[in-house]
Design a protein with these regions (language model features):
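C-terminal ends of transmembrane helices
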Residues: 7-19, 154
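Membrane-interface helix caps and helix-loop-helix hairpins in membrane proteins
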Residues: 16-18, 40-48
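Small-residue-rich segments of transmembrane alpha-helices in multi-pass membrane proteins
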Residues: 27-39, 58-61, 171-173
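Alpha-helical transmembrane segments
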Residues: 47-65, 139-147
């Protein structure tokens, strides 16, 4: 199902005239790979390890986008920014910072998913209620906080950066 949704998102973006995004292609490739592995192997381990695997690959894609000098957020930002700003240092800086915040969010989710997987795969915590509580916080609590912080930062940072530059340089952005 997730593979079909990832493919559908790519098709929908193209239908709407939007560019193909690295993150969407990467997600489709990972989901297709996980689907194939699940079909051809004993996939019982996937119940425990699927979330860390997906978060790990997402994290790798995001870090790779920065490493090659094309922060993944630029692909999304270009859809709402005029072409004349795409190559400016400010546009690159803003998107690099936003990408790093999203990397931090996904890294937190990855760690939370690892904690949950480790708890589910062994007798680390002997009290079932304590284990369930830790799993809930590591899974849902971390995910919600990480995503909210990343979304808020994404909405806040571009204007905050431009305002700071105006104050520092005494000019309009």
């Amino acid at each position: 199902v997730a593979t079909a949704l990832a493919a559908g998102l790519l098709v929908f973006d193209r239908y709407e005239g939007r560019s193909t995004k690295l993150l969407n292609v990467g997600t489709l490739v990972v989901m297709a790979g996980v689907t194939i592995v699940g079909v051809v192997t004993d996939a019982s381990w996937m119940d425990t390890w699927l979330s860390p695997i997906l978060n790990g690959f997402l994290l790798l894609i995001m870090v790779a986008s920065v490493a090659v000098g094309r922060p993944f957020t630029m692909e999304y930002a270009k859809e709402s920014a005029p072409p004349e700003v795409w190559d400016t240092p400010a546009f690159r800086h803003i998107n690099t910072m936003i990408t790093w915040v999203w990397i931090a969010a996904v890294a937190a989710m990855f760690v939370g998913a690892i904690v949950v997987a480790l708890l589910q795969s062994g007798d680390i915590v002997t009290d079932p209620q304590t284990q369930k509580s830790i799993e809930s916080w590591a899974n849902w609590g971390v995910t919600i906080v990480a995503l909210v912080v990343a979304m808020k930062f994404t909405g806040w940072y571009p204007d905050a950066y431009k305002e700071r530059q105006q104050r520092l340089h005494g000019q309009a952005a």
